[in-house]
Amino acid sequence: MNSVTKAGAPQFWMGGVLARDLIEVSSDPSCLADGDFWAISTTYEGEFRAAKFKTITNEAFPAVSPTARVSGKWESSTSESEYIQYVEKIREKIASGGVYQVNACRRISIKSSATLDLAFANILKSNPAPFASYLRFTDMEIASASPELFLTRDCDQIKTSPIKGTKRSSSEKFGNKDRAENIMIVDLMRNDLGQICIPGSIAVPDLLRDEDHPGLSHLVSDVTGTLRSGITWAEILTALLPAGSISGAPKSAAKRIIAELEPTARGTYCGVLGWVHGDQAVLSVAIRTFWRESEFIHFGTGAGITWSSDARAEWEETQLKAERLISIVGGQL
């Protein structure tokens, strides 16, 4: 049976874990060393926010009183023609060397007073993503339908599961571009984990797995490692952020191109969202994610660009990733 949380009260929910009764908020990753339960959110740009909660229970997402859905037209930070130009500029940079893949994103926004807890409750019913999560405290509210694992940690064992490759149905086949993209990011994540793991412990136990998700199929791989003794959460996050799947390869070059060519900061989109409890953790990549800033609700969508990308097809992929969730939350894309 669903519990009921006071409207507007700080809370966190992910995978049947409900956290309530906020104790403190921190912007310093060293707070995670105290061994307590923290819900965390980082932005793509690296801003860290964490909330410590007193009461942790295993239960369904709390019941939400029905309110108005989002209505109206969502506006994109980048038009179709502008996005196509962005993709072509990335392809030019790939042709000149120095970068192999860049994740090209855009933000869609709408002015709305609708609450994201109702949006999240509807997402859980109609789009039950494996890493769906909800976080609300102080001025932050996030409702995520993420399909992608940023990391799990169990003592000294760590795993990341990057997604590269998206198609509409399980009957279609992933193309060479999808497989090449995924392998590039697997190599990148092996390198990132190598900064914090025992030499020789990095493994790829599952490569190019076809996963079905609500309305979509994704190509997923697992990369694992054994953490070095004494490694801190601050060191882990520094080594791995931002996620390779939403930046590109090489990561440093892709980040420079994104900063140069994308018209708005990504913010919550493409950061991470989840929980840390001592040496245990589940963190998702904050894709398929809604978040509130003042009077506006935002949603991000993007596609991985390689030399073989077709710019118009990449735009259509960003539409595909957005359309199902927008139909659930409300408004017109």
Annotate the PLM regions.
Residues M1-L333:
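Extended alpha-helical targeting/anchoring segments
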